[in-house]
Amino acid sequence: MLKRIKIVTSLLLVLAVFGLLQLTSGGLFFNALKNDKENFTVLQTIRQQQSTLNGSWVALLQTRNTLNRAGIRYMMDQNNIGSGSTVAELMESASISLKQAEKNWADYEALPRDPRQSTAAAAEIKRNYDIYHNALAELIQLLGAGKINEFFDQPTQGYQDGFEKQYVAYMEQNDRLHDIAVSDNNASYSQAMWILVGVMIVVLAVIFAVWFGIKASLVAPMNRLIDSIRHIAGGDLVKPIEVDGSNEMGQLAESLRHMQGELMRTVGDVRNGANAIYSGASEIATGNNDLSSRTEQQAASLEETAASMEQLTATVKQNAENARQASHLALSASETAQRGGKVVDNVVQTMRDISTSSQKIADIISVIDGIAFQTNILALNAAVEAARAGEQGRGFAVVAGEVRNLAQRSAQAAREIKSLIEDSVGKVDVGSTLVESAGETMAEIVSAVTRVTDIMGEIASASDEQSRGIDQVGLAVAEMDRVTQQNAALVEESAAAAAALEEQASRLTEAVAVFRIQQQQRETSAVVKTVTPAAPRKMAVADSEENWETF
């Protein structure tokens, strides 16, 4: 039955039983403590009542004694034989004692009453107290008034005896209550001890039952599981694991049995995998050796290619430098042609200015020729007029003739100058035309030189681009050479790793040989696992070889 109950449920039941025992014992102890508290309260109340009532009784007795002494002193003073304290001092002392009695009585009445105390007895003692107290107060008044006869005639002793009787009865009643409370305390203590013993017996019985249940449902299955775990740790995977019960221990045993089965399968797979790894590592080592040889050949080819690229880079750089110098020379020629074109433009402008000035001079000469013609006409008119004047106008005619001659010579000179100016203007026009033609030619030269300069610049730029491209190709080839060298090193490391893997596979095979599993399962797994990986590895090596040959 215990094997079918879950451990958690068992623990909850144990906790519930212990909790119930704790609650039961706690309730019983609480009841005992409650009774003890009530009895202690009764004892405390009785003690306080007795203390305050006794204080009031003593104060009343002291008041009466003081009043008796005061009365005697009063009588002695009347006979002139007194000495010691005066009547006034004794009466004051009696008043103080009476007030103390009143205070103690007030404290007594303020205390709570136990239900078991007699109400009639309390009322009777209060009545006798009031009588005795009032009698003492009356004695103080009588003695103060000098009524000594009434003072001694008062039956104070009877009042005192009555109060004392009730006081003794009340004290006897409190003593009985005190004895009852003590007896109840003793009974509560005995009951608590019996409860403690009973609870201890029940707890011991529950502990024994719990231990028996734990041993049957937890310890024994745990020992069996520990023994199975030790066999598994020793490499024995064949010994069966017993599953008994459906509680947590049964589930743990079932899980351990499942783990044993999985471990058997895993160990078989590890053995087969180790064999496959050993075979694959051998193939990898062979392929790596072949790959290492081809990598070395490829590295040598890349070194030759890198050397050729360096020579080609040097040649292209030299061509780029020559193209750059030719571009600079063409640029210089273009600048010179541009300056020549500017000079020709200036000459053309100057020739145009000269042509304009010559035209202006021709215009001025035309004006001079007109003036000479008009002067000649005027001289002719003057000669005609002088001829008409006869002898008187002869001198004027001579002058007019000279003026006419001068006008004719001026006209002749003007015509010659005009002819020369016109010839000069014609030549200047021809020169201007030639200079303009030369300017256009210089512009064409400048344009051609500019195009040549642009072409040379493009050639130089292309040469620079080619140089940079060849540099990049050289860097790429160098990087390929470096990567090839690294690949060669990695191939060597891979070969070493394959050898190490082969050794580790051998060690792994030796390590898993410690475990004992079913022979049939091991052989079946070995056949399946060792045959399948061979073809992919071969094809991987072939692909690698084809890639290297193509590269």
Swiss-Prot record:
Name of the protein in its database record: Methyl-accepting chemotaxis protein I
Organism, as annotated = Escherichia coli (strain K12)
Its domain of life? Bacteria
The HAMP domain sits at: 216-268
The family classification in the record reads:
Belongs to the methyl-accepting chemotaxis (MCP) protein family.
Topological domain (Cytoplasmic) residues are 1-6, 211-551
Q: Which residues carry this modification: Glutamate methyl ester (Glu)?
A: E304, E493, E502
UniProt function note = Receptor for the attractant L-serine and related amino acids. Is also responsible for chemotaxis away from a wide range of repellents, including leucine, indole, and weak acids. Chemotactic-signal transducers respond to changes in the concentration of attractants and repellents in the environment, transduce a signal from the outside to the inside of the cell, and facilitate sensory adaptation through the variation of the level of methylation. Attractants increase the level of methylation while repellents decrease the level of methylation, the methyl groups are added by the methyltransferase CheR and removed by the methylesterase CheB.
Q: List UniProt keywords, sorted A-Z.
A: Cell inner membrane, Cell membrane, Chemotaxis, Membrane, Methylation, Transducer, Transmembrane, Transmembrane helix
